[in-house]
Structure formats: C-alpha cells, structure tokens
Regions:
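Non-heme di-metal
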Residues: 1-195
C-alpha cells in the first residue's frame, strides 16, 4: 500500500527537484550539484522505485494510474507548493526533508524486506528480488558526497539548528507521517501545522 501511495509523489519528484535546482543562485554550487543528481533526469531512481512496487505485487498497469488518497494528495501538494515557491529556500528545505525521510525509511525497513524475501525466495527470481530492493538499498547506504553537499547547501540558506522545524520541512514531514500512518498521538504537535 505504501509503495503505491508514494508513487505519485515519486513520479513528480524529478520535476520538483529540478525546479528548485534551477532557482538556486549561481553561488550555491554544492546545492546545484546535489540537486542535479537528485533531479534524476534519466529517471534512474524512479525506475528503481517502480521495480520495488512490482516486487510488492503492483502491476505496471496499476502504476499508470495515480492512487490519490488524502495523505498522498497532501504530500504531493506540500512538495509542489514549496518547490514552486518564489523563495528557493523553501524548496531546498522540502527536498532535504524528503531525501532524509527516504533515507530514514530505507534504513528502517530494508532489513525487514530482505528477511521477508529471503524467507520467500522460492516465490521470486533472484533478479526480481535484487531489482526490487535496489531503491531501498541505495537509500539506506551513506552517501558522503551528498551529505557534504547537503550540509553546504543548508549553510548557504542559513538554516540554524533550533527547537522548531522550518515550515516547509514540517509540512512535508507531517504529510509523510500521515501517509505512513504514524500514530497521530505521537506526532500531534507536528501534525497540527499540516492540517
């Protein structure tokens, strides 16, 4: 269900990231490099994610039609809003939030998926499993260069550590919480800003 619910967001992500990349000032070289790679002009990450969906039992025909549940709509709208903002800082915060959330999700679920498909290896080909888990594996690995570029990009927009999340980050994160069906009681203070 999560695979299919995230698909519309994943499909829009290259466009959203490219909008932010193209709005950055010339002096934000690290940000341009990072967003240039994340924009996925060749749709490599998107193809990996589609293979993950197929491994989860979703047909390619199902991927042609968006499943726009309320949480999916909220996530797509939040990401679009901040990536299309005239203030590139908003888009940077939205993209960084989405990227860090993808990393956290992959690191927390990869082992579970690997165990499941290992236990059911007789039901899938080795290639299906490898291809289907590639997106999770990629996002669970550390990417030092990306981390350095991300830190420099955040320094360039002068994001200081603090007690509260910037609004774009909070709204994208809250939309993800809803989509992932995180317990509302645990996230109530964060969810208030997304309603």
């Amino acid at each position: 269900e999560i695979c299919l619910s995230l698909w519309p967001f994943i499909r829009e992500l290259p466009r959203n990231i490219a909008l932010v990349r193209d709005s950055l000032p010339e002096n934000m070289e690290a940000g341009k490099k990072l967003l240039g790679q994340l924009a996925d002009d060749e749709l490599t990450y998107q193809t990996m994610y589609a293979k993950q969906c197929v491994l989860a039992g979703i047909t390619p025909d199902q991927l042609k039609f968006d499943v726009l549940s309320e949480p999916t709509q909220m996530l797509c709208q939040a990401m679009r809003r901040w990536c299309e903002s005239p203030n590139y800082r908003d888009g940077v915060l939205a993209v960084v939030t989405a990227e860090l959330a993808a990393t956290a999700y992959a690191r927390n679920t990869l082992e579970i998926f690997e165990k499941y498909f290992s236990d059911h290896a007789d039901e899938y080909s080795k290639e299906e499993i490898e291809d289907g888990l590639e997106w999770l594996r990629l996002h669970s690995r550390p990417h030092t260069r990306h981390a350095i570029w991300m830190r420099r990009m955040l320094d360039d927009i002068e994001v200081a550590p603090g007690d509260s999340l910037p609004v774009p980050a909070e709204q994208v994160l809250n939309a993800l919480y809803r989509l992932w069906k995180c317990p509302i009681e645990d996230n109530k203070p964060l969810l208030e800003g997304a309603l």
